[in-house]
Amino acid sequence: MNGQSDYKGQRTAGMRGMSMDNILGDPFALATISIAMLAWFIAFIGSILATASHPPGDGFPNYSWFTIAYMLCCILGIFVVIASDTTQTYHVAIVGFLATGLVLTSSSVNSLIYSSNGAKEATAAGHILLSMVAIVWMFYFGSTPSAVPRAYLDSFALHKDHRVSSGRGMSTAYGNGYGHGYGNGRPDTSISSNVPPQMYTSAQLGGFETSSPVAGFPGGAAGAERNSSQPRFGASNLGPNGAMGSESTPGEVVQPTEYPYRAKAIYSYDANPDDANEISFAKHEILEVSDVSGRWWQAKKENGDTGIAPSNYLILL
């Protein structure tokens, strides 16, 4: 329920946050939309001149007018989607509409390109440009953000998160086998069956453990499952009265006191109320991280709160 409500909130916020900065700050979007509008005007003016120079029903295909109207709607729709930063919400629909538009523009080119009339040739040239832009858009919107060509184009955009291609990389940011993929929706924090969960000892999480049993958190052996979607940690080192035991072994790892890494939240996250180890954070919030080797990172917020956070909600800076 939290994931669904957060997704709806992000989508609504994206529509309310429509801004020209998303267009002007993205060279690819600015260039392709500008070329598409120029091509549309060429086709539109050429169609007017071609229709005026021929008697009604003679020479100029009527469906070319529908093509012009249809492509205008596609261009305006893409403009709105990019300006509202909801590309990953509507990218499938965009590809479908562009595929239909490519068929229409190609048919118009085939009907007009062989004419000796200059107005028809100009109209055909406009439709050719529209077809080329449609092909580029279909490749862009039909690719995942982790695709190398799209990631390269997105790297020039000012408003988009730039993800590194090595180390943790984009596969972690977009699920790494256990997320829902990509987009404005939050990824899932559940664990897939083909990757073992990350285990921690009580010494590693000494500062995160509670002084009393938490409801829904059975004290079984390490790896025991619980009803939550979060991974099960190692057995606690609690004493009989609920306090942390004083015994320590040479092999134990002390609680980290340094946080050498910085990470940015690419999604907001609400901590599980049944697990006091987790911390909540907002989208774009900066966290300090002590260890980036597992799925759950030990993090500290700017206000000093410490806890664990899912790695697929964060991106290293």
Swiss-Prot record:
Localization per Swiss-Prot or TrEMBL: Cell membrane
UniProt family annotation: Belongs to the SHO1 family.
TM ranges: 28-48, 63-83, 93-113, 122-142
Ranges per topology, Extracellular: 49-62, 114-121
Topology feature Cytoplasmic, residues: 1-27, 84-92, 143-317
One GO term describing the cellular component: plasma membrane
Residues listed as glycosylation sites in the UniProt record: N62
Lineage per the UniProt record: Eukaryota, Fungi, Dikarya, Ascomycota, Pezizomycotina
Keyword check for Cell membrane: yes
Alphabetical list of SMART domains matching this protein: SH3
Membrane topology: Multi-pass membrane protein
The entry's keywords: Cell membrane, Glycoprotein, Membrane, SH3 domain, Stress response, Transmembrane, Transmembrane helix
Organism name: Sclerotinia sclerotiorum (strain ATCC 18683 / 1980 / Ss-1)
Pfam families attached to this UniProt entry: SH3_1 (PF00018)
CDD domains for this protein: SH3_Sho1p
Function: Plasma membrane osmosensor that activates the high osmolarity glycerol (HOG) MAPK signaling pathway in response to high osmolarity.
Protein name, as recorded: High osmolarity signaling protein sho1
BP GO terms, sorted: regulation of actin filament polymerization
Domain SH3: 258-317
Region (Disordered), start-end ranges: 216-255
Subunit-level organization: Forms homooligomers.
